[in-house]
Amino acid sequence: MSASYIPDAGDIVWLNFTPQTGHEQAGRRPAVVLSPKVYNSKTGLLVCVPITSQIKGYPFEVLLSGAEVSGAALADQVKNLDWRSRQARYKGKISIAEIQEIKAKLAALLTFV
């Protein structure tokens, strides 16, 4: 991907998640971008969820079926990261159904009473 790449919602990108603490995902790993390109471009940040290959049947996992990456998006581990300093690299795109499922699980988690 060219140096002019700007992440967009639905993209799968490789990011460096280190440093992290506790149960958070760390290391260089794929993530699903949730924020739109216009936000990512203006702020230099992106909102994303990490992807794991260790599928455990956890309620907030969203299985990804595309050829770009195998695993599950962790919809409850939302991050807002500097995508340039975390060395974002484009890997592929998830389906509209998959991004809708991530957003639905996130909405359930953030429901305010």
Where are these regions (language model features)?
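Conserved functional hotspots at enzyme active or ligand-binding sites that engage polyanionic ligands
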Residues: 1-113
